[in-house]
Amino acid sequence: MAIMRGNVQKTLAGGERHTFRLHLAYSIIEGFILGILALNEFVFIKSLSGSDYELGILFQFSMLVFLLLVFVNEFLKRIRRRRIFLRWVGIITRFPLLLLFFFPRSPEVYQNGASWHMIFLAIFLVYYLAALVINPTINLLLKNNYSHQNFGTLYSYSQSANKVVLLVVTFLYGLLLDADNYAFTYIFPVAGVLGMVSVFLLSKIDYTPPEIIRIKTTFGQSVKNSMQNMYLILKNNRPYLHFEIGFMLYGIAFMTTYAVMTIFFYNALGLNYSSVAFYKNGYNILAILLLPLFGRIMGRLDPRRFAIITYTSLAGYLFFLILTEYLPYFTTIWGLKIYYTLIFYVISHGFFAASMVLLWNIGSAYFGDDHQADIYQSTHLFLTGVRAIFAPLAGIFIYQQLGYT
């Protein structure tokens, strides 16, 4: 990774090099946090005895918050000191993770009352709210500091580093949870502190907003204007509309199956934490190898065509997951239950993970001007929130009525 970083930085202009270093550091720290979050749903149903619908809500929160972007967008436009604001967002949304240190370490407590489940859900609702500010801001910062030809490549390098850290942390965290089912009570506070540090690093990336003369309006009128702007972007930019239609159909499929997959791993396959860590993250080994290649491809290819890789691989890994219920053959290696059909699931998921992280995070930036990158990403994320209203819980309902397959 150090060799890759050195070779990249030799070919970059000063501003790009500074941005790349900060974004790389941010991505590495976020990789640690995401490695912990990779097992969050499984922790919720296994260690905290959460119900199926509560599990669906936990996942739903991570996407549903994007509905608020229509309000947050207008609020952000009124913030002149965005760097300071970004740091406060990091503190306010990451600090509640420290409260998990005080959670009980007894299974009886979680089985006999739902109050701890509600507190857990509330903590992560606050955590996910940060994405309303951070996700569009990342696109804005990078699009205005990276050249068009380097944008996809540099982003893929940072994501490769992110995936390496995520991979290692998830496996180690899975082993730790097998030894101590309540290890989350002291791991999440560490993640909270690191989350504040990562957002601080992100806020150090240079950005000078363009001088725009704005007509003073009420906040309500501004929200209405924001909705109209989203509508006009979709109406007038046909390629972007096609991109979002494809994403809407994909997103419904992804959201309806995500929480059910966790239940399937726990109830149907009887996996321990280490095995779940393998299946939910082993595909990142392939994703790490593919990301630099996919980053270069995305810089040269229409994102709508690039999406074919993502959607096809999603269908592939769901197919092999379904097949496991009919061909439940496995072997045990070092305490890991290796299902033969799930090997192909991991391969398909590797292609999905490598392509989706690029398409979902920066795909929208290719359809507008540099200073519109945050607006396009906000529209993209808002539509994510729209499908999150119904898709995750619909998946739980369908599973309970009809079964896994």
In which residue ranges do the predicted regions lie?
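Helix-loop boundary and gating motifs at the non-cytosolic
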Residues: 2-69, 73-76, 83-87, 99-101, ...
